[in-house]
Amino acid sequence: MTEETPGFEEKPDVPSGATPDDAEPQAASEEGAAPAGDASENAGLVAQLDQVRTALNERTADLQRLQAEYQNYRRRVERDRVAVKEVAVANLLSELLPVLDDVGRAREHGELVGGFKSVAESLETTVAKLGLQQFGKEGEPFDPTIHEALMHSYAPDVTETTCVAILQPGYRIGERTIRPARVAVAEPQPGAQTVKPAEDAAEAQDSSGAEDDAGTKESGGPDEG
């Protein structure tokens, strides 16, 4: 029976004729392959990172676009809501204008007394809170966008078409005119603008003649020959 000698291990099989120097190139090639593999892996990670960044930028742009569209939608809905409210209020107040006209006539004739006066004042306060404004005053220039001329006349003391009487007041809500003011207007007297310059020229000529006479008197008259 063969006994193993303590302290000795079996040696690996080594090809015949191999030397220790033959193992060094193999180890060097394995060490050189490792950095090349790391560089390839890093390049792949960089490419993936670029793809993720591109996708993130695209999604961010999509979210920003959706947010802008939503904000525009909210503003449009709010604008439409305000417009619908204004139209509804205007339609309601238009139905109350004849009542307000009756209240105004009663006030002019001194008939706005008692309980009728309280109801009328309450109505006027309510419509004012809803934004109803009355307009139209005597003496203001005629504006066809807010005035409706029912009567025409001529007056020598006006230089432009002027409202001389308010037959029915106008009403508006903000910039929206519910009813134009119905008025009587006076226009400048025909020929007044042409006569006045002639009168001014005559007055200027008379004044010039008077100055010439005064100068002649101061100089002692013409020289005696």
UniProtKB/Swiss-Prot annotation:
Key words, A-Z: Chaperone, Cytoplasm, Stress response
User: Cross-referenced CDD domains, in alphabetical order?
Assistant: GrpE
Residue ranges of the TM segments: none
Locate the region Disordered: 1-44, 183-225
Gene Ontology molecular function: adenyl-nucleotide exchange factor activity; protein homodimerization activity; protein-folding chaperone binding; unfolded protein binding
Establish whether keyword Nucleotidyltransferase is in the entry.
no
The GO biological-process annotations, alphabetized, read as:
protein folding
Query: Mainly localized where?
Result: cytoplasm
- Looking at the UniProt record for this protein, which Gene Ontology cellular component terms does it annotate, in alphabetical order? cytoplasm
Subcellular location(s): the record lists: Cytoplasm
What does the function comment of this entry state? Participates actively in the response to hyperosmotic and heat shock by preventing the aggregation of stress-denatured proteins, in association with DnaK and GrpE. It is the nucleotide exchange factor for DnaK and may function as a thermosensor. Unfolded proteins bind initially to DnaJ; upon interaction with the DnaJ-bound protein, DnaK hydrolyzes its bound ATP, resulting in the formation of a stable complex. GrpE releases ADP from DnaK; ATP binding to DnaK triggers the release of the substrate protein, thus completing the reaction cycle.
- What name appears for this protein in its UniProt entry? Protein GrpE
**In which organism is this protein found?**
Streptomyces coelicolor (strain ATCC BAA-471 / A3(2) / M145)
